[in-house]
């Protein structure tokens, strides 16, 4: 563990090494030398150096001493604000502590010898935070508590190590992206790369907690409230350093009770709660820290960037990415050199589909910290999402060069190679992922798929078997079944190599005919599948449509006025995200993040076409109502009620015709963009229509298959069927087991899955037919009934003939 005062001493040694003229300041030339020296692997241009120095000298202007330049306190502050990593820079410079240096430092001010001796002893006993001028120990009695606690922790660790109860997660530190959050206020050392898991159910741990309670009682018995606060904060920090997070939280909570308006205990409690996976409670503590910092004037102003960053990260832990973006932006505005804030902002923007903005933020982070592997990884992912694949490959490779075992970079680069059809290279990337993370089942599955794409069927089969050992997910069994079907097909081809053709041909839509009224038309199914895919990604079907009605009834939204003076209940995107979190509270954070990304890209981008960042809440409710859970008729009713809830219609039982037309065209623009976007252009050009529409008239407009949103009847059919399996039936084109509806060609008997039918794919064997007649079966039971009816009719006909 880092010793007391060592962090400040490291900064001092760095400062002394580059203060060439010993004038107590770092000039631009000296700062330039420092930046270059601590980034030995980076080749800076003169423009980059100049920009970095301009930013530093502007941000820390209060620490600039005339021509001398940046003072020692200024350099220390840059590290405190997260603009650099002290330990990394110290190691990069190859500086070592030695007895001569320590002796010289002590001799430089030999007065008050006894106090210096006492301080030197203190510095040998615990961590750097304790001697920080802003966040360290204030009272002498607190030192005694800290020393006693260190003995207790050491004893507990020794006993648990001896009994083999102490677990240390010794994962490859290169494998994962950095958390990027500020663990401390002011000078600190980060938690060890090795996560420690204490055995809390052991007898030794119980004894430790009991003895810890005695120390807490001593802190409570201090002579003043300030001293008690100092004691509990120090106890909490020591426990936090040793990764005893639950016990540390108790101490920080007690400190919060003693001084509710102090930023530090709330911040520390938030950190503990985040590590313990209690993201909502963590967010609440950071909000209290933010409130205290903002009301405390300039006293805590320099801590605001750290609070904003950690608040953003705790929100991401809940899946609230849009809200997190707001706080990362605030941190970056307050501290423009905070490269972690910029990186986190870029990553969050990527997470909600704002790729161009993500690229800009990530490039700024890399500009400030060129060896930031995580920023390179997310920048490459953003570039790939924008279609700049070759540049993305270069940036992914740069991330891997900086961190050879970077799992995210290796895995995502493998996915990029798969998209480009470079299967052999993809397989190599997934192999490297598995070398770092052997039980990464997705990498193992993707390796099998890439090997299959590369034509190495036997290797693919072995890789799939390995994946099955890691997990028993149904998609793996489908993949194995698919592989077997392909092998069967391959054997048939070998016996008839002269007529070997591609796996399918695409037939024009007019050649696909339907048998029976219940069989879905091919174009309708293609659109419905897209809507259903969006519905599944967003999990809106898990939100009962009645929950939308309750939101409208129970939560008041203030009325605002748009540019043309029309009253509206508009809301900012982050606030809308909070509402969606309530509606989709059953989703895990990572699933909710995916839902927000899809909603932001598909719905909010259309509703907020002006880029104001605000959305008409009533229209939003009406747009998502058709995809929520519940009976289709109820969904339509709630959509109509959402339009009634808008200020222009409130209090009435009817909506304006123009509002109804706008709604229908918005639905088509969002969910059927190939047909609907051109119609939206007409909406903005229409004159005001004061006529009104009843609910029944609204239903007629809604259900119109050509100009309305009648496609929802097909979507509802998919909702009820898309988990149906058809026994051993496989699609004649893709060879995957058929799930959902089965489309059987009545003349030749081949069957297609939903996807292949919607895309017009047929086996090349049947390409000579003039037309193809399909009957749709919801299940094999339905198919068997149809077959029995057919046999019965044939038998009956024969009897009559006789």
UniProtKB/Swiss-Prot annotation:
TPR repeats lie at residues 229-262, 264-296, 305-338, 339-372, 373-406, 407-440, 442-474. Residues 6-41, 595-630 form the EF-hand domain. The keyword ATP-binding does not apply. It holds the Pfam family TPR_16. This is Uncharacterized TPR repeat-containing protein At2g32450. GO terms for molecular function: calcium ion binding. Keywords: Calcium, Repeat, TPR repeat. InterPro entries: EF-hand-dom_pair, EF_hand_dom, TPR-like_helical_dom_sf, TPR_rpt. Gene3D superfamilies: EF-hand (1.10.238.10), Tetratricopeptide repeat domain (1.25.40.10). The lineage of its organism: Eukaryota, Viridiplantae, Streptophyta, Embryophyta, Tracheophyta. One of its GO terms (cellular component) is endoplasmic reticulum.
């Amino acid at each position: 563990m880092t010793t007391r005062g060592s962090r400040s001493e490291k900064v001092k040694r760095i400062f002394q090494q580059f203060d060439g003229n010993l004038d107590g300041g770092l000039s631009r030339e000296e700062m330039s030398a420092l930046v270059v020296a601590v980034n030995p692997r980076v080749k800076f241009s003169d423009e980059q150096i100049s920009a970095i120095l301009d930013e530093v000298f502007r941000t820390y202007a209060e620490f600039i001493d005339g021509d001398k330049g940046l003072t020692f306190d200024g350099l220390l502050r840059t590290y405190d604000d997260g603009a650099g990593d002290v330990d990394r820079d110290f190691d990069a410079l190859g500086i070592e502590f030695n007895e001569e240096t320590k002796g010289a430092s002590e001799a430089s001010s030999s007065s008050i010898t006894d106090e210096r001796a006492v301080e030197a002893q203190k510095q040998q006993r615990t961590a750097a935070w304790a001697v920080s001028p802003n966040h360290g120990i204030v009272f002498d009695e607190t030192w005694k508590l800290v020393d006693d606690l260190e003995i207790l922790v050491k004893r507990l660790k020794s006993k648990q190590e001896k009994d083999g109860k102490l677990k240390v997660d010794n994962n490859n530190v290169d494998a994962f992206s950095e958390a990027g959050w500020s663990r401390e206020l002011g000078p600190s050392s980060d938690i060890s790369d090795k996560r420690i898991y204490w055995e809390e159910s052991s007898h030794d741990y119980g004894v430790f907690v009991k003895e810890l309670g005695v120390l807490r009682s001593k802190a409570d018995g201090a002579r003043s409230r300030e001293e008690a606060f100092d004691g509990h904060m120090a106890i909490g920090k020591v426990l936090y350093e040793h990764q005893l997070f639950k016990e540390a939280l108790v101490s920080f909570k007690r400190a919060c009770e003693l001084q509710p308006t102090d930023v530090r205990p709330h911040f520390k409690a938030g950190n503990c709660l985040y590590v313990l996976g209690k993201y909502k409670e963590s967010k609440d503590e950071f909000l209290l820290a933010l409130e205290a910092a903002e009301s405390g004037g300039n006293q805590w102003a320099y801590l605001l960037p750290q609070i904003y960053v950690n608040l953003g990260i705790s929100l991401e832990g809940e899946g609230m990415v849009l809200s997190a973006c707001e706080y990362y932006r605030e941190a970056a505005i307050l501290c423009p050199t905070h490269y972690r804030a910029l990186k986190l902002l870029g990553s969050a923007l990527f997470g909600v589909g704002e790729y161009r903005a993500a690229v800009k933020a990530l490039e700024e982070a890399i500009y400030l910290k060129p060896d930031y592997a995580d920023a390179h990884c997310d920048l490459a992912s953003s570039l790939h999402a924008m279609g700049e694949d070759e540049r993305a490959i270069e940036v992914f490779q740069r991330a891997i060069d900086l961190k050879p075992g970077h799992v995210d970079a290796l895995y995502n680069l493998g996915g990029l190679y798969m998209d480009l059809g470079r299967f052999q290279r993809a397989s190599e990337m997934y192999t490297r992922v598995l070398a770092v993370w052997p039980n990464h089942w997705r990498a193992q599955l993707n390796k099998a798929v890439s090997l299959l794409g590369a034509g190495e069927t036997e290797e693919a089969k072995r890789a799939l078997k390995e994946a099955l050992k890691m997990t028993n997910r149904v998609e793996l069994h489908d993949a194995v079944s698919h592989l077997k079907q392909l092998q069967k097909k391959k054997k048939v081809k070998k016996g008839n190599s002269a007529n070997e053709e591609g796996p399918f041909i695409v037939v024009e839509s007019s050649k696909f005919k339907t048998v029976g009224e219940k069989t879905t038309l091919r174009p309708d199914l293609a659109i419905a599948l897209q809507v259903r895919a969006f519905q599944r990604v967003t999990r809106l079907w898990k939100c009962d449509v009645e929950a939308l009605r309750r939101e409208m009834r129970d939560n008041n939204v203030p009325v605002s006025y748009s540019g043309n003076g029309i009253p509206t209940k508009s809301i900012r995107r982050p606030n809308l995200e909070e509402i969606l979190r309530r509606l989709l509270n059953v989703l895990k954070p990572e699933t909710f993040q995916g839902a927000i990304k899809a909603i932001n890209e598909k719905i909010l981008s259309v509703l907020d076409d002006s880029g104001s960042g605000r959305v008409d809440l009533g229209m939003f409710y009406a747009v998502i109502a058709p995809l929520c859970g519940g009976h289709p008729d109820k969904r339509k009713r709630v959509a109509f009620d959402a339009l009634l809830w808008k200020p222009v219609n409130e209090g009435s039982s009817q909506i304006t015709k123009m509002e109804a037309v706008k709604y229908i065209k918005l639905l088509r623009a969002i969910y059927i963009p190939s047909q609907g976007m051109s119609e939206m252009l007409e909406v903005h050009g229409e004159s005001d229509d004061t006529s009104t529409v009843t609910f029944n008239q609204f239903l007629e407009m809604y259900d119109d298959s050509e100009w309305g949103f009648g496609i929802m009847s097909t979507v509802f059919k998919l909702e009820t069927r898309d988990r149906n399996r058809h026994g051993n039936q496989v699609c004649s084109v893709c060879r995957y087991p058929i799930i959902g509806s089965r489309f059987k060609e009545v003349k030749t008997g081949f069957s297609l899955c939903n996807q292949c039918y919607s895309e017009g794919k047929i086996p090349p064997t049947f390409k000579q037919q003039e037309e193809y007649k399909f009957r749709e079966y919801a299940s094999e039971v339905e198919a068997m009934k149809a077959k029995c009816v057919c046999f019965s009719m044939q038998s009956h006909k024969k009897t009559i003939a006789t």
